[in-house]
């Protein structure tokens, strides 16, 4: 990895998305996806084409190793995902090693912090701040405004041009900071409880999205990503879902709890999870079957849940 420079970088790992796909006799994987920002038809494609952005984690540096530092870190975790997947989907496996337990939690937490939506939310906040800054500066006849400790000149520039320049300059620091925050959270949550849910009913399935980690917090409606009380949920494939709970949920270290749902319980569980995926997604819903996405869209339209 260190000798080859990656340009198209997946912010949701292809190896993860493959578990929601179907392989043909040539071992080529395909998934169905729906772009909720366009609201058009459901299409099929390779997971390699989804959830990818050019130079997303590219760092500053003179060597490939320096520029690839963050991308290589994520790729190293991704190479272990098949092992993680086998652990989570083995119904007979309850007790695991400390190393495997921590690897599962590391994957979920880093996935929470590496998606494009998190960066888009930051850019939207910047855009609002720049619009206000430019407006105030114009009132005083100035050609610049201050954002934090930085002076932002805007003469003959649109807000979008300023935002693009700022993002290009600051992106490496922000990417590194997000990884740093993720690792700090992991160190505080690496002994947390793991619960796996399995759907044993062919009528119901989980799907995923371009922002697949969902957050639940029963103690407050105003929480941060780094809140230790957050429950972190991730759909693993069409039949499996993992939730990471605070440590106290399971008193025995490195034990996993497993729950099996069918019938009405499976229906309720998958509807709830899939609606959360629709709400959290920046653009794409992703599934192994077209009808799974169609059912979510139908439920949302029928119950007027788009907003």
What residue ranges belong to the model's regions?
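Alpha-helical structural context detector biased toward long hydrophobic helices
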Residues: 1-8, 14-307
């Amino acid at each position: 990895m260190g000798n080859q420079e990656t340009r198209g970088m997946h912010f949701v790992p292809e190896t993860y998305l493959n578990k929601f796909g179907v392989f043909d006799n040539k071992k080529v994987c395909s998934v169905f996806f729906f772009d909720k920002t366009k609201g058009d038809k459901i299409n099929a494609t390779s997971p390699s084409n989804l959830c990818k952005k050019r130079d997303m984690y590219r760092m500053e540096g003179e060597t490939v190793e320096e520029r690839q530092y963050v991308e290589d870190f994520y790729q190293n975790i991704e190479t272990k995902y098949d092992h993680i997947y086998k652990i989570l989907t083995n119904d007979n496996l309850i007790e695991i090693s400390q190393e495997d337990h921590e690897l599962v939690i590391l994957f979920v937490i880093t996935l929470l912090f590496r998606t494009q939506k998190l960066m888009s939310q930051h850019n939207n906040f910047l855009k609002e701040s720049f619009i206000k800054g430019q407006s105030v500066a114009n009132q005083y006849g100035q050609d610049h405004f201050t954002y934090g400790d930085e002076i932002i000149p805007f003469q003959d520039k649109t807000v979008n041009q300023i935002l693009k320049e700022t993002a290009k300059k600051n992106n490496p620091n922000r990417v590194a900071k997000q990884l740093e925050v993720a690792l700090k959270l992991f160190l505080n949550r690496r002994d947390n409880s793991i619960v796996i849910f399995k759907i044993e009913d062919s009528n119901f399935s989980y799907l995923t999205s371009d922002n697949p980690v969902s957050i639940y917090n029963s103690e407050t409606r105003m929480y941060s990503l780094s809140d230790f009380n957050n429950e972190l949920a991730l759909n693993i494939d069409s039949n499996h879902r993992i939730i990471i709970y605070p440590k106290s949920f399971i008193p025995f270290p490195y034990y996993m709890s497993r729950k099996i749902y069918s019938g009405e319980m499976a229906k309720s569980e998958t509807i709830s999870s899939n609606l959360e995926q629709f709400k959290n997604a920046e653009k794409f819903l992703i599934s192994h079957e077209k009808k799974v996405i169609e059912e979510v869209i139908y439920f949302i339209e029928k119950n007027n849940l788009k907003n």
